[in-house]
A protein has these predicted regions:
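Short beta->alpha connector loops
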Residues: 37-38, 61, 107-109
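Core segments of cupin and vicinal oxygen chelate
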Residues: 14-58
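Short, solvent-exposed beta-strand edge segments and adjacent coil->beta transition regions
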Residues: 6-10, 73-77
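Flexible, disordered linker segments and immediate boundary regions flanking tandem C2H2 zinc-finger modules
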Residues: 136-142
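Short beta-strand/turn micro-motifs at beta-sheet edges
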Residues: 1, 62-68
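Short glycine-biased active-site loop of nucleotidyltransferases that positions the nucleotide triphosphate
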Residues: 44-48, 66-69, 115
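Short connector loops at helix/strand junctions that flank enzyme active sites
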Residues: 51, 70-75
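Vicinal oxygen chelate
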Residues: 15-20, 72-73, 79-123, 128-134, ...
Length: 197
């Protein structure tokens, strides 16, 4: 028997400066402050679905604290999903407008992602995932990730942000899976109704 975890509840980050982290996650990424505990320290933020999603604990000695380094054991990144490729483009532009350096972007075939760091150096990802991603790649994606061009603040935006993505072939595959999924759901519903109580 295993523990039956229903979902990931929240993440708590130790930060060099609670106020800087609060500003970054609320003003740049759109989190809302759910609660602050000035007496004991701590800022609790939410995306609106739960009481808190991401919390910050002030490091007791921020001058001595070390930022995470690439390649060390620990958190690689936290990922935040958006609902469309247009929303990913808006996020990219918004990050640049706030002076955030985007390290890289990737086309994972079933999703496109942009990667950057928070003020403490924690890795973050914003991504748009295609509908029916599991059904599109039932055998897995393999290692077919494609690096995408990125731009710095003030530079021209990369062309992939403005592509019609996914293209016509992938859209046709998604539509076929959607229709098949609906047909299977309708068939199950008809079967349940046909069974006498």
């Amino acid at each position: 028997m295993t523990i039956r975890i229903s979902k990931l509840g929240h993440v708590n980050l130790r930060v060099a400066d609670e106020e800087t982290s609060k500003w970054f996650y609320t003003e740049v990424l759109g989190f809302k402050v759910a609660e602050e505990d000035p007496e004991h320290g701590g800022v609790f933020t939410t995306l609106g679905e739960d009481f808190h999603t991401l919390d910050f604990a002030q490091h007791p000695n921020p001058e001595a604290a070390q930022k995470p380094k690439a390649g060390q054991i620990g958190l690689v990144h936290m990922a935040f999903q958006v609902d469309s490729h247009a929303a990913l483009r808006e996020a990219y532009i918004h990050l640049l407008e706030h002076g955030v350096e985007i390290h890289h972007a990737t086309n994972h075939l079933n999703q496109r992602s942009i990667y950057f760091n928070d003020p403490d150096g924690n890795g973050l990802e914003i991504y748009y995932e295609l509908p029916y991603a599991l059904q599109l790649f039932p055998e897995g994606r393999g290692d077919e990730d494609e690096r995408l061009e990125v731009s710095a603040p003030g530079e021209p935006l990369p062309a992939w942000l403005f592509e019609d993505w996914p293209g016509p072939e992938m859209k046709a595959r998604i539509e076929a899976i959607r229709q098949q999924t609906q047909a299977e759901a309708a068939s199950k519903s008809d079967t349940k109704e046909a069974v006498p109580a």
